[in-house]
């Protein structure tokens, strides 16, 4: 996937290297954001989580790129593709496109990594890149994903020992 990729910015690449994430401010224009929210409004109500990890008060809508062209356009955004091109091996693949809508009263997930299934010891070279597109305010109070800056450089032992279910959600290391 390298359709119309532009150059990644030096700042974004430096942030990804040092802290493990970067933010693309103003990623969705108003028209695209309105389209995404209208689609979600129409679809929500039939996709409750199936287990404790997914959450029983959370809805997940899978395969967004198969549902509407707007999601294909988001996935192929040149700013994201530029980062993928700079950081991943050629011919990388999209493995998931989903919406996660966390409902009131949801139990927080235990801290985890999204690349646990790669059988390569940590710390390791970048083998995947996750993209989160927030379509509303995104914070700990409404269940927004929290990240630990620099945790992408941790060893397997550090990842395994950091967080256990029931630990304080107010941990200052969580950003």
Question: Which residues does each PLM region occupy?
Answer:
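Double-stranded beta-helix
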Residues: 4-5, 138-175
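Short, conserved beta-strand element in jelly-roll/cupin
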Residues: 121-140
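Short C-terminal domain-edge/linker segments immediately following a structured domain
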Residues: 54-57, 125-131, 160-168
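Short, structured patches in soluble enzyme cores that scaffold and shape functional sites
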Residues: 113-115, 133-137, 147-149
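Structured loops at beta-to-helix junctions and adjacent beta-edge loops in soluble globular domains
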Residues: 27, 102, 134-136, 150-151
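Non-heme Fe(II)-dependent double-stranded beta-helix
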Residues: 1-19, 24-123
């Amino acid at each position: 996937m390298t359709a119309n990729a532009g150059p990644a910015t030096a700042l974004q690449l430096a942030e990804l290297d040092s802290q493990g994430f970067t933010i693309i401010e103003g990623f969705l224009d108003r028209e695209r954001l309105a389209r995404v929210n209208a689609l979600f409004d129409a679809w929500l109500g039939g996709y409750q989580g199936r287990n404790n990890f997914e959450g029983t008060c959370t809805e997940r809508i899978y395969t967004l790129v198969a549902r509407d062209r707007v999601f294909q356009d988001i996935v192929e955004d040149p700013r994201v593709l530029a980062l993928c091109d700079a950081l991943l091996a050629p011919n990388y693949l999209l493995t998931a496109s989903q919406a996660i809508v966390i409902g009131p009263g949801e139990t927080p997930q235990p801290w985890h990594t999204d690349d646990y299934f790669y059988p390569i010891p940590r710390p390791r070279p970048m083998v995947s890149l996750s993209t989160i597109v927030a379509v509303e305010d995104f914070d700990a109070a409404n269940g927004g994903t929290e990240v630990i800056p620099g945790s992408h450089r941790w060893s397997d032992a550090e990842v395994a020992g950091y967080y256990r279910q029931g630990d304080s959600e107010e941990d200052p290391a969580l950003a």
